[in-house]
């Protein structure tokens, strides 16, 4: 289903196609669940009255080696969003680059620490170059599903728990 909707935030209220809505969301991290279970999970979410699913994206799962990206199998964010859409769920994507989520190194790839000039989670140009490359590849997967393109992705949260370290 393509939603062809207008989504707005006005003050503390959310509006879909001009009508005030409440977002009732649950978190499901696609990379922590088998792809075969996504549809069943979403059906159960709908049965509980939820209308939205929120998911982190773990950079260290998608780019295990510098410049080598994987969006297959349980890492297929596009299929995850497509399955949510099929179940009439809106989607909030939280791509990081840091996600926390009780996930190793907050989802940052291990290799990012190997450069002595690297400073993470700041405006360090080396760090920015790497995470911009990751976000570019990830957004290529997500872009077709943005609400502005008729898809179910209504919001994105970049970074997470900044200044909590």
Language-model regions, residue ranges each:
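N-terminal carbohydrate-binding accessory modules
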Residues: 1-52, 82, 86-90
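Active-site region of glycoside hydrolase catalytic domains
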Residues: 8-10, 81-82, 86-165
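Aromatic-lined substrate-binding rim segments of carbohydrate-active enzymes
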Residues: 38-106, 110-112
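Aromatic-residue detector
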Residues: 13, 21-22, 38, 56, ...
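The substrate-binding groove and active-site-proximal loops of carbohydrate-active enzymes
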Residues: 23-35, 59-76, 113-133, 159-165
């Amino acid at each position: 289903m393509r939603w062809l909707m207008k989504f707005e935030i006005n003050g503390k209220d959310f509006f879909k196609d001009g009508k005030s809505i409440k977002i009732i969301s649950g978190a499901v991290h696609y990379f922590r669940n088998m792809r075969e279970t996504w549809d069943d999970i979403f059906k159960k979410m709908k049965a509980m009255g939820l209308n939205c699913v929120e998911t982190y994206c773990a950079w260290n799962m998608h780019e295990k080696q510098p410049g080598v990206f994987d969006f297959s199998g349980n890492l297929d964010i596009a299929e995850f969003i497509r399955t949510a859409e099929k179940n009439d769920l809106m989607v909030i994507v939280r791509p990081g680059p840091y996600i926390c989520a009780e996930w190793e190194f907050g989802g940052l790839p291990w290799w990012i620490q190997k450069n002595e000039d690297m400073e993470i989670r700041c405006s360090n140009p080396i760090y920015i170059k790497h995470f911009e490359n990751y976000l570019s590849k990830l957004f290529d997967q997500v872009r077709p599903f943005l609400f502005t393109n008729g898809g179910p992705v209504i919001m994105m949260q970049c970074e997470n728990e900044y200044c909590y370290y």
